[in-house]
């Protein structure tokens, strides 16, 4: 329970940090107006908002690329695990198992692994009882 509370507190803290914006003074907005020849204060706020968005896009791009790399590596690991399990479970050669796994979609591979490890976990739990 305390892990849940700590996780909830961290999420709330990050949400507050993400929502907080630096204080904008009228002087800073006037400088932006002069630089961009803006007549309206709302246009200056809009330009500052666009400047903040570029930073967010850079961060989103970094985390998006990192996520894609992690996902690619886990997909490769799942393929290898599925082949090993098929070889051991069905007693077929590695090439035959690889051909079967290649014919399966990613979703089917995930389901196959979940079934295998789910049965394994259920057996271990029943042994403990």
Swiss-Prot record:
Signal sequence, start to end: 1-20
UniProt GO molecular function: toxin activity
Subcellular location: Secreted
Coarse class of the protein's main subcellular location: secreted
Residue intervals passing through the bilayer: none
A family per Pfam: Latarcin
The organism's place on the tree of life at top rank: Eukaryota
Disulfide cysteine pairs (residue numbers): none
This protein's UniProt keywords: Antibiotic, Antimicrobial, Cytolysis, Hemolysis, Secreted, Signal, Toxin
The keyword Lyase belongs to this UniProt entry's keyword annotation: no
A biological-process GO annotation: killing of cells of another organism
Statement: the UniProt record of this protein carries the keyword Secreted: yes
InterPro entries: Latarcin_precursor (IPR018802)
Residues that make up the propeptide removed upon maturation: 21-60
GO CC field: extracellular region
Distribution of this protein across tissues and organs: Expressed by the venom gland.
Recorded family membership: Belongs to the cationic peptide 06 (cytoinsectotoxin) family.
Functional summary from the UniProt entry: Insecticidal, cytolytic and antimicrobial peptide. Forms voltage-dependent, ion-permeable channels in membranes. At high concentration causes cell membrane lysis.
Name listed for the protein in its UniProt record: M-zodatoxin-Lt8j
The encoding gene: cit 1-9
């Amino acid at each position: 329970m305390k892990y849940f509370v700590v996780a909830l507190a961290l999420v709330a803290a990050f949400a507050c940090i993400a929502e907080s914006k630096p204080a904008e003074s009228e002087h800073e907005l006037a400088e932006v107006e002069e630089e961009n020849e803006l007549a309206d204060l709302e246009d200056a706020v809009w330009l500052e908002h666009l400047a903040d968005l570029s930073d967010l896009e850079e961060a989103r791009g970094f985390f998006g690329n990192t996520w894609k790399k992690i996902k690619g590596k886990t997909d490769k690991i799942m393929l290898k695990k599925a082949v090993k399990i098929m070889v051991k479970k069905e007693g077929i050669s590695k090439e035959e198992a690889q051909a079967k796994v290649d014919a399966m979609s990613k979703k089917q591979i995930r389901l196959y692994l979940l079934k295998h490890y789910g049965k394994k976990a259920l057996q271990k739990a029943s042994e403990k009882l």
